[in-house]
Regions:
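Small-residue-enriched segments and motifs
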Residues: 116-118, 173-174
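C-terminal accessory subdomain/extension
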Residues: 123-241
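Active-site loop/helix belt of alpha/beta enzymes
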Residues: 4-117, 124-125
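Proteins enriched for Cys/Gly/acidic motifs involved in redox and nucleic-acid/cofactor modification
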Residues: 1
Length: 241
């Protein structure tokens, strides 16, 4: 017995369970986001053919399912199939690329921003240290530091310590010292007159500058999807048109 028949047998057993009301059959593409790799394209085609064959076997056995779906974000863009009744858009809903920097054949724009507030501004003297471990020490007397109300408990990764920038008044300002649970510190010396209560942008646009989830992801070896999904529940969500 081939694996397609075995899968159809298992599906039939599940569908026959008393507490189950089956509406469809689906799979999930593993490498649909690699359109320039021949092996990945072939693998995705085989996945598609496999689920279609299992679906047809079930139909031939008199089992009718309303839905057949296997298209994720990349699949819907590169491997669309008229027999698929649904698409499961994920990362593309955030306006992010499934496999950054590989572009999609459609235009997408990031839709999520992450903002926080400056809670304190102070001047640093030469040799002053910032945050846990004293990993940052001021090199000079003309450095303005701003404490910002966001930290790794909000889902802004501690791995971005000393690596990422934050937008303040349209200027990129580097994170100095280690990111804390509830706050981080910026060098805002190049941002002009920064005051307490100033809104800063950790993800999104401010003036002509933009920081994307993909940019942050590249700084600590992950994907943009993890960055946006990692923002914790305690961060208020504001939905705009």
């Amino acid at each position: 017995m081939c694996i397609r028949d075995r899968c159809a047998d298992e599906a039939e057993k599940i569908i026959a369970l008393e507490k189950i009301s089956a509406e469809g059959l689906y799979t999930h593409f593993a490498v649909a986001d690699c359109p320039d790799d021949e092996e990945s394209v072939e693998y995705t085609k085989n996945q598609s053919d496999f689920i279609l064959n299992v679906y047809d076997i079930l139909c031939n056995r008199g089992i009718k399912l309303e839905h057949l779906h296997f298209l994720n974000s990349a699949g819907a863009c590169y491997h669309n199939n008229p027999r698929s009744t649904l698409a499961r858009a994920g990362i593309i809903m955030y306006g992010l690329y499934p496999n950054y920097p590989v572009k999609l054949p459609i235009k997408v724009e990031p839709v999520m921003s992450l903002k926080a507030v400056v809670s304190q501004v102070k001047k640093l003297n030469n040799g002053d240290s910032v945050s846990y471990g004293r990993t940052y020490r001021a090199d000079g007397d003309n450095i303005t530091a701003a404490t910002v109300t966001v930290g790794y408990a909000d889902g802004y990764s501690r791995l971005l310590s000393g690596k990422a920038d934050v937008l303040v008044k349209g200027k990129r300002c580097p994170i100095i010292g280690r990111i804390c649970m509830d706050q981080l510190v910026l060098d805002v010396s190049g941002a002009g007159d920064v005051k307490e209560g100033e809104i800063v942008t950790l993800i999104g646009k401010d003036g002509n500058e933009e920081i994307t989830a993909d940019e942050l992801a590249s700084l600590y070896g992950t994907i943009g999807y993890e960055v946006v999904c990692g923002i914790s529940k305690r961060v208020p969500r504001i939905y705009v048109d």
